[in-house]
């Protein structure tokens, strides 16, 4: 390697930072040849590094015999170049390039490495299948989209650390090898060689450890942490993902929400130049479910669910009247301009809602020139139809869809339909951001399949002040479990939950009662959470916290379609890494050391 190259590694210039003020200066650059054009005696090379692209010009009369080296350059060759920065002629200015008014005229060129022809175009405007990009992830990094998202990810996390450091938070790493407590998703298990037939679990969250840190007096903790869940994957799920995990001592829910609002406002402004207005709006869990059919409502558009049970309870349409009589509900969602929806589309919606949400049917009415029209409107009095139209604010050209069933089925099915139809009829404005707190969650939810109470968030969530009397005895708790609310809160952005948390239980007595109502007996509680329960007896302060999904936030803020778009080396929806080809078999010797024998599948 020529001496001028090694001497200039630390003195290099960055392509994207060059400008006209450096005209006449000698420039040293390192990077990859993105494009090249041979025009006979003059070769133009678009040299790309992490910061951008600059045009370098190789002229035969200046390079002499070295010009033959420039003729060998091909796509993605690794180059070292030295030359003089000059302004381009007016006719050769490229307004689409950040450095389109300048170029570097070469006096030295070295090919540091050659490259095979890439299996796909690295031009950001060319479409490439996700499978191919995941297999050759190292090439995808050279494309503008992924590279820029990785840089934004770095800036985002750096801004978080900087802000929290100023707010007296301490970053502490919690264990990756942990105890299995399979309360939610499946754990990833790691066999212990030194302790045969014993297993570690990769953490689904640092929940217990951060509470232990509060007992230990650390008071303000945060961590950018990897978490692991062995679950079926969707667009916004990965087996390993990154959270901003936080915990505070001696705080109320109000103080936590205020602290988080300051953090979010600051990092959105610093990294994405997005100006947010704080405090964020708040909505109760009950309102979210009743009006939007979701605990993470997208509030960028209307189409609320409207309860018309009182209007239709005495109508002649038995599907509606019967649902109300049996303790259910009837709701309607009005779709602006939806009268163009075809019967075939309605049949498809009906089948989908039946399959995925157990909805028994999907009644509908169109708002025509004479009011509401449908095959079922003859079963309603004129006043009833007018009252339905008034309740949901329908006008000519709109379509009304009805759900009539148990309240939970109606809310979930119409909530899902609302989201699907918004894509066509009430598409949110591009770059619009709506952030809302969802508060006053139920503490428990009834599991119909297992006939038991489950924690809506997790077993360590504190009851609200209004619900504390329910915990005076197990008898009162059994009677009122369905009415107990929690000091829990979720932060929702554009219909996606980006963070959530709660005030924690710091009383051993209340924690024991929560375990009991969840069907966790004393022995099981001690086995799974014994060290936390013991810690609560050594002066646990009032504390609470939350966790943000870093990947989800970045997906939304960078316009990604999936969190795979903002993770450096993501897995597919089958949990595979196409680049490294993992998971993979291991040698028999390794299994023997772990005392593991494989079962045939």
Swiss-Prot record:
Annotated Pfam families: GAD, tRNA-synt_2, tRNA_anti-codon
Binding site for L-aspartate: 183, 229, 457, 504
Binding positions (ATP): 229-231, 238, 497, 549-552
Cellular compartment(s): Cytoplasm
Gene Ontology molecular functions: aspartate-tRNA ligase activity; ATP binding; nucleic acid binding
Any one Gene Ontology BP term: aspartyl-tRNA aminoacylation
Catalytic reaction annotation: tRNA(Asp) + L-aspartate + ATP = L-aspartyl-tRNA(Asp) + AMP + diphosphate
Keywords assigned by UniProt, alphabetized: Aminoacyl-tRNA synthetase, ATP-binding, Cytoplasm, Ligase, Nucleotide-binding, Protein biosynthesis
Chain residue ranges for the region called Aspartate: 207-210
Cellular component, GO, one term: cytoplasm
The protein's Enzyme Commission number: 6.1.1.12
NCBIfam families xref list: aspS_bact, PRK00476.1
Subunit structure: Homodimer.
Protein family: Belongs to the class-II aminoacyl-tRNA synthetase family. Type 1 subfamily.
Function, in words: Catalyzes the attachment of L-aspartate to tRNA(Asp) in a two-step reaction: L-aspartate is first activated by ATP to form Asp-AMP and then transferred to the acceptor end of tRNA(Asp).
Name of the protein in its database record: Aspartate--tRNA ligase
Origin species: Leptospira interrogans serogroup Icterohaemorrhagiae serovar Lai (strain 56601)
Origin organism lineage: Bacteria, Pseudomonadati, Spirochaetota, Spirochaetia, Leptospirales
Gene: aspS
């Amino acid at each position: 390697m020529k001496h001028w190259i090694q001497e200039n590694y630390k003195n290099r210039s960055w392509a994207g930072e060059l400008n006209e003020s450096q005209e006449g200066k000698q420039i040293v650059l390192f990077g990859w040849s993105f494009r090249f054009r041979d025009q006979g005696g003059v070769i133009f090379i678009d040299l790309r590094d992490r910061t951008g692209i600059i045009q370098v010009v190789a002229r035969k009369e200046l390079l002499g015999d070295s010009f033959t080296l420039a003729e060998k350059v091909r796509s993605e060759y690794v180059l070292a170049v030295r030359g003089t920065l000059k302004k381009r002629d007016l006719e050769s200015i490229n307004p689409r390039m950040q450095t389109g008014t300048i170029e570097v005229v070469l006096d030295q060129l070295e090919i540091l490495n050659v490259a095979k022809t890439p299996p796909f175009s690295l031009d950001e405007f060319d479409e490439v299948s996700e499978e191919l990009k995941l297999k050759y992830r190292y090439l995808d990094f050279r494309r503008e989209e992924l590279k820029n998202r990785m840089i934004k990810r770095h800036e985002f996390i750096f801004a978080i650390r900087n802000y929290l450091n100023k707010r007296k938070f301490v970053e502490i790493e919690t264990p990756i090898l942990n105890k299995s407590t399979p309360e939610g998703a499946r754990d990833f298990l790691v066999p212990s060689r030194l302790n045969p037939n014993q297993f570690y679990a990769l953490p689904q969250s640092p929940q217990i450890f951060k509470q232990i840190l509060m007992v230990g007096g650390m008071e303000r903790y945060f961590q950018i942490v990897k978490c692991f869940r062995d679950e079926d994957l969707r667009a916004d799920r990965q087996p390993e993902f990154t959270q901003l995990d936080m915990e505070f001592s001696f705080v109320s829910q109000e103080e936590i929400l205020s602290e988080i609002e300051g953090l979010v406002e600051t990092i959105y402004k610093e990294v994405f130049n997005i100006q947010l207005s704080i405090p964020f709006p708040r909505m109760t869990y009950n309102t979210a479910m009743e009006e939007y059919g979701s605990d993470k409502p997208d509030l960028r558009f209307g189409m609320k669910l409207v309860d018309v049970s009182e209007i239709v309870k005495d109508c002649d349409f038995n599907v509606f009247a019967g649902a109300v009589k049996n303790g259910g509900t009837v709701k309607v969602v009005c779709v602006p301009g939806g009268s163009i929806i075809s019967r075939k589309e309605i049949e498809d919606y009906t089948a989908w809602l039946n399959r995925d949400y157990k909805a028994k049917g999907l009644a509908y009415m169109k708002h025509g020139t004479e009011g509401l029209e449908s095959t079922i409107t003859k079963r309603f009095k004129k006043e009833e139809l007018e009252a339905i139209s008034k309740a949901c604010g329908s006008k000519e050209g709109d379509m009304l869809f009805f759900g009539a069933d148990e309240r939970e089925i109606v809310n979930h099915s119409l909530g899902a339909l609302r989201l699907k139809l918004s894509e066509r009829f009430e598409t949110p404005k591009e770059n619009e951001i709506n952030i809302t707190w969802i508060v006053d969650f139920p503490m428990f939810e009834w599991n119909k399949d297992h006939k038991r109470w489950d924690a809506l968030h997790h077993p360590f969530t504190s009851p609200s002040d209004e619900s504390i009397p329910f915990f005076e005895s197990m008898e009162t708790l059994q009677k009122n479990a369905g009415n107990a609310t929690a000091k829990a809160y979720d932060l929702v952005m554009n219909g996606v939950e980006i963070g959530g948390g709660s005030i924690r239980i710091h009383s051993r007595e209340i924690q024991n009662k929560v375990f009991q109502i969840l069907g966790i007996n004393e022995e099981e509680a001690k086995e799974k959470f014994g060290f936390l329960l013991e810690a609560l007896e050594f002066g646990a302060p009032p504390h609470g916290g939350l966790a943000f999904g870093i990947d989800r936030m970045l997906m939304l803020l960078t316009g990604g379609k999936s969190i795979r778009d903002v993770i450096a080396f993501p897995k597919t929806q089958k949990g595979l890494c196409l680049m490294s080809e993992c998971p993979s078999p291991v040698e028999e010797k390794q299994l023997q050391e772990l005392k593991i024998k494989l079962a045939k599948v």
